[in-house]
Curated annotation (Swiss-Prot):
Gene Ontology molecular function: NADH:ubiquinone reductase (non-electrogenic) activity; quinone binding
GO CC, alphabetical: NADH dehydrogenase complex; plasma membrane
Entry keyword annotation includes Iron-sulfur: no
Encoding gene per record: nuoK2
Record organism: Aquifex aeolicus (strain VF5)
UniProt protein name: NADH-quinone oxidoreductase subunit K 2
Amino acid sequence: MKTIPLEAFLTVSMILFGLGLIGIIARRNLVTVLMSLELALNAVNIALVGADHYLGLAEGQIFALFIIALAATEAAVGLGIIIAIFRLKKVESTDEIRELRG
């Protein structure tokens, strides 16, 4: 049975993390920023599972499950906050939220 090399896991993980980071920095829509954050968290999961596969330990999978639970909680709370902001102020972008201060 062929095994996937650790470099493949880490390369895919770095690419996905970079795309997520670019989405967080470049996008202004709140939902898109939240989705980019989820992409970055999933990239970390891929790196952890790849390291677990390479080292033969279970800690990577345990941490990945913890991050999945954390990401689900973060998505639920984040979407709730985004919906509340939109209902109160009719704001969709991060620039408009900065203007609401004061």
